[in-house]
Amino acid sequence: DGLYAVDPMRVATRTISGLYDGATTAELDELSIRTAALLTGEEPEYGKLAARLLAGVIAKEVAGQEIHAFSQSVQRGHEVGLANDRLLALVQPNARKLNDALDVALDRHFDYFGLRTLYDRYLLRHPRTRKVIETPQQFFLRIACALSEDVPGALALYRRMAELDYLPSSPTLFNSGTTHEQLSSCFLLDSPQDSLESIYSKYGDIAQLSKFSGGIGVSFTRVRSRGSLIKSTNGHSNGIVPWLKTLDSSVAAVNQGGKRKGAACVYLEPWHADVEEFLELRDNTGDEARRTHNLNLANWIPDLFMQRVEADADWSLFDPRVVPEFTDLFGGDFERAYAQAEAQGKAVKTIKARELYARMMRTLAQTGNGWMTFKDTCNRASNQTLRPGNVIHLSNLCTEILEVTSNDETAVCNLGSINLARHFHDDGLFDFDKLAETVRLAVRQLDRVIDLNFYPIETARRGNLRWRPVGLGCMGLQDVFFKLRLPFDGDEARALSA
């Protein structure tokens, strides 16, 4: 496509003015790319220019290592210990067909920031030189081959990804075809049991999952509250805050495969006696020893709490050691057990429900944390909880996944996203047939992830193989409305999105 609004001399002049004596050609390339990118705010076509310049730099970097075809890229990856045997076994006997299928022209679909992110974080790099050993199209074809059983399936998936019709999640993009194929996005861990051994075991599980690019959701509702008696030592517990401080440091220390920061969200039910201190963990003032700036926080709220808020009634806080059954109850069962515990005088403290709710809202407004998630609604609406004994104890890092967890099963979700804006006929109408084909292909790929996956911990393998959950989302709905000239809140837009 012609970039008719771009002034090449303007980019060249600015680039030259930023040079210094002794600058290398690599520095010249990088300066020209960033110069073009900085002009994107004035004219979007400069972003396309920056992307094309960067694509040229990537191609030159790969070719400089004597890698001129997809099969050579996979071979080099295998030689340096990055690509696995299964990928090589598919690629080697089908090298000509796969090499011929690669379409460099599809790089045009990238804008600058997308391609820059791909270059900085996703493309495989030589472990010693740190140079990329694959181009963007070789990257897509590697993933497609790793996720497919045969060449036709690989080529079909490659075209969908290269055209940006559909993309799997980041862990799938990071790790497909590598020696550690951890391809799942989300891991939901039930609360550690109320023991030193269980808490430290949970730290280890979280570190292993984060190491291989997993996002973490974990409950801490079962852990006893501050002041609770420890029978073995006749001492008193410091509550959940010191444990979460340790988890905070661990999440910061163990990043996601060197690609991005570790990330975790901790869920707590509002009857836990440490809930007020929990809501202070992300505050910017106060004792730093009781602050966790790397953890995200979420409230796991039963309907009974909201009913007490509406009625301006009292709310009782309990030590989980005294009422361990609360965590595995929801709906009417929880409400009856809660009322009985109140009547028996087991509460550690009683406060006004609205005061606690106001503190939740203040935390949410000031820090963006303390997300409101509703325990009873989640459990009632789930097909998993129809089986006796199954309970949803939390959501995930991004709060879009709801699955049952237990001490023996870690919930997993395998994610992908369809780009709705890429599903149009040439005449400008939305292509529902193409969407159906993309959905069918995506679901098969996501299901295959479950079988191919490397599981850092056994409880994740057990949960994923038992339930086989997939999460297929979509993006680009606003772009669809824009292309069709539909008001976002209009009846036609509502009908199309439904």
List each model region and its residues:
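Extended catalytic cores of very large enzyme megasubunits
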Residues: 1-498
